[in-house]
């Protein structure tokens, strides 16, 4: 019989590992992992990471040997409760009756599965006693159950099979019914995260690491399913099943068996808590190495051309391999500690099972118990082993899910420095009365020690065009970012038609401004989509007209797929001039009241530039335009030219007036003409 017990224990362990592998493969569709990582059950505990030097504002994992202070512990508890409250709200969506019905149906399937599962050891005991008995009277005496009065071994064994199959069917049905709830939750949270990231200011996105951010979002989204499943189908049912088994053993076989069960469960849980706490640092190291490797790979691929220019393929591979080595080392430590954890859990359960079997065998020899009783005790303990194994795994996965969710929630708690003010009354929209722009003693710096704008003041009259020229780093592009409110001033004001842009809604401000950036990055989609993006309500003919005004229509029509041509990652399938003209077409399609162009023609040849400047002049009619101009031939066609140097306005006037002053602009003009002559 002990061989049978060991066999059952082995089955429990195998079943547990198969389920772990199943979870791992279901998650692999979201994100690829190194093969050394076995399953989400390789785990970490929920701790409150200290700030990291990462540019993602420490929104990545790290490892530390420092201990937590009481305040940190309170923060961790509060964070865990907040996460669980948020996840719980998705279980019972008040505005979605279908999902609420699915939760109720899944719980009903859970109850049905547990009810049938409890019948299995009873039916198995009865069949053993029936087969061990030689007369119906003996059968009835040894089995004081109503079923024993009319049962036959075959019918009981058929019932045994039905109970096992029914329990499995209810479990699978529960999974199928509940899957839409978890998937809808993942969808809702993922959309919320993306929307929140778009709401954050430019400063945050300039400092972030795309690879690490992608990992945080992926792991956080996957953790939602883990935590939801644990809350509904693992934690409470496991506690219920442990209580039921302990009660049945105490009622049928005495308090000794109940005591053995209680001690083994307590030891199992305590051992799992202690060892998993120790394993926290390894999982955090894995997360950090995973983030770093992902960031390195993405950065290397994004800069594919630069890598090729300098023949640094081997260097990139070595750097990536070094980070993978860090991940491998941390994963190896995780695997070793997991093996120790699994062995300890198996040892505790094996000890409890062996002790119970010895007591049963003594009871049989003393005539106090039947062979069926031994089988029933074995079955109940084996039945208890599965939730115990799952309790450890679910606990580890849930805690790891909390770690991943906390990082995701920290991302959601990021607040933008740029946005509509939090006031009791909503900010009014911008009221356009022509589109005049004024800077009033504006100071700004990206870093305290580096001044970008140093008290600049100027005005662009409504419907006029102004060119801003100057050497690199003089603050020209920053001015455009200030107008669009990518950044706010350190002091001073920026006004449009006399209205402080901080005192109007961002949506109304940005809806009336068109921007052609210096570095044009296109979506990995068709040319039509990239132009149409400027005004999603525009018709096809309006898109074609915008392309004609940007002098790109004829070029597009020569492509095999015409407007359906894919531009590739970041528009790399197009030349620099083609990308810039697509960006111009996009701005033309928006047809804004204010147009901001940051060296919009610097990648164009002289002929194309002349054609586009004609279009600009027609577009600029009755519109306020600001051009950041590297080519002074572009600047000379504007109504006024502003010359900047070291964050200050040093000259203002028309092209002819500035040439007559023989100042900074005149020198720039002479330098460019000399270069052209050479």
UniProtKB/Swiss-Prot annotation:
The chain crosses the membrane at residues 104-124, 143-163, 230-250, 255-275, 338-358, 374-394. Pfam families: ABC_membrane, ABC_tran. Residues 1-63 form a transit peptide. Residues 437-671 form the ABC transporter domain. Keywords: ATP-binding, Ion transport, Iron, Iron transport, Membrane, Mitochondrion, Mitochondrion inner membrane, Nucleotide-binding, Transit peptide, Transmembrane, Transmembrane helix, Transport. It is a multi-pass membrane protein. Disruption phenotype: No visible phenotype. One of its GO terms (molecular function) is ATP hydrolysis activity. ATP binds at residues 446, 470-481. Residues 103-400 form the ABC transmembrane type-1 domain. It comes from the Eukaryota. One of its GO terms (cellular component) is mitochondrion. It is found in: Mitochondrion inner membrane. Expressed in roots, leaves, stems, flowers and siliques. One of its GO terms (biological process) is intracellular iron ion homeostasis. Belongs to the ABC transporter superfamily. ABCB family. Heavy Metal importer (TC 3.A.1.210) subfamily. Performs an essential function in the generation of cytoplasmic iron-sulfur proteins by mediating export of Fe/S cluster precursors synthesized by NFS1 and other mitochondrial proteins. Not involved in the export of cyclic pyranopterin monophosphate (cPMP) from mitochondria into the cytosol. Homodimer. This is ABC transporter B family member 23, mitochondrial.
């Amino acid at each position: 019989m002990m061989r049978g017990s060991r066999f059952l224990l082995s089955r429990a362990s195998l079943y547990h590992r198969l389920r772990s592998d199943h979870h791992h493969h279901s998650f692999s569709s979201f994100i690829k992992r190194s093969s050394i990582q076995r399953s989400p059950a390789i785990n970490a505990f929920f701790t409150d990471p200290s700030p990291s030097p990462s540019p993602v504002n420490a929104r990545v994992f790290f490892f530390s040997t420092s201990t937590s202070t009481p305040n940190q512990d309170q923060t961790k508890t509060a964070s865990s409760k907040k996460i669980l409250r948020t996840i719980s709200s998705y279980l019972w969506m008040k505005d979605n009756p279908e999902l609420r019905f699915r939760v109720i149906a899944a719980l009903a399937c859970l109850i049905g599965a547990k009810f049938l599962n409890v019948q299995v050891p009873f039916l198995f005991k009865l069949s053993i006693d029936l087969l061990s008995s030689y007369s119906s009277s003996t059968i009835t005496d040894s089995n004081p159950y109503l079923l024993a009065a009319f049962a036959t071994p075959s019918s009981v064994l058929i019932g045994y099979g039905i109970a096992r199959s029914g329990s499995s069917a209810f479990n699978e049905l529960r999974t199928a019914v509940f899957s839409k709830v978890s998937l809808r939750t993942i969808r809702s949270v993922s959309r919320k995260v993306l929307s929140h990231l778009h709401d954050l200011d430019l400063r945050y996105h300039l400092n972030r690491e795309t690879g690490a951010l992608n990992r945080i979002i992926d792991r956080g989204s996957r953790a939602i399913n883990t935590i939801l499943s644990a809350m509904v189908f693992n934690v409470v049912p496991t506690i219920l099943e442990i209580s039921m088994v302990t009660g049945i053993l105490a009622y049928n076989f005495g308090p000794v068996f109940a005591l053995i069960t209680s001690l083994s469960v307590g030891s199992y849980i305590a051992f799992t808590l202690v060892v998993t706490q120790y394993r926290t640092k390894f999982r955090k190291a894995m997360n950090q190495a995973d983030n770093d490797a992902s960031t390195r790979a993405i950065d290397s691929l994004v800069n594919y051309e630069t890598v090729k220019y300098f023949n640094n393929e081997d260097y990139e591979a070595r750097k990536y391999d070094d980070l993978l080595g860090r991940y491998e080392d941390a994963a190896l430590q995780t695997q070793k500690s997991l093996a120790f954890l699994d062995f300890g859990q198996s040892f505790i359960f094996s000890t409890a099972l062996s002790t119970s079997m010895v007591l049963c065998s003594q009871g049989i020899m003393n005539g106090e118990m039947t062979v069926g009783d031994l089988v029933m005790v074995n079955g109940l303990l084996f039945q208890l082993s599965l939730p115990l194994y799952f309790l450890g795994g679910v606990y580890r996965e849930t805690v790891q899910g909390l770690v991943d969710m906390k990082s995701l929630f920290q991302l959601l708690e990021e607040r933008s420095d740029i946005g509509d003010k939090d006031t009791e009354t909503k900010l009014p929209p911008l009221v356009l009365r022509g589109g005049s722009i004024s800077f009033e003693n504006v100071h700004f710096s990206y870093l305290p020690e580096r001044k970008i704008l140093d008290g600049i003041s100027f005005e662009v009259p409504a419907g006029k065009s102004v060119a801003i020229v100057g050497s690199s780093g003089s603050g020209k592009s920053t001015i455009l970012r200030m107008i669009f409110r990518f950044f706010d001033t350190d002091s001073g004001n920026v006004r449009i038609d006399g209205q402080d842009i901080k005192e109007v809604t961002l949506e109304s401000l940005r809806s009336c401004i068109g921007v052609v950036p210096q570095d044009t990055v296109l979506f990995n989609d068709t040319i039509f989509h990239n132009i149409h993006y400027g005004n999603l309500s525009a018709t096809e003919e309006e898109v074609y007209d915008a392309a004609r005004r940007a002098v790109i229509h004829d070029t597009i029509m020569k492509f095999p797929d015409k407007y359906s041509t894919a531009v590739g990652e970041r528009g790399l399938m197009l030349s620099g001039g083609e990308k810039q003209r697509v960006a111009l077409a996009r701005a033309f399609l928006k047809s804004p009241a204010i147009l901001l162009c940051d060296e919009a023609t610097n990648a164009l040849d002289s002929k194309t530039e002349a054609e586009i400047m004609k279009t600009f002049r027609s577009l600029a009619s009755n519109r306020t335009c600001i051009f950041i101009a590297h080519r002074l031939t572009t600047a000379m066609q504007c109504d006024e030219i502003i010359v900047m140097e070291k964050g200050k306005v040093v000259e203002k006037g028309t092209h002819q007036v500035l040439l007559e002053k023989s100042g900074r602009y005149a020198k720039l003009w002479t330098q460019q003409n000399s270069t052209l002559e050479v």
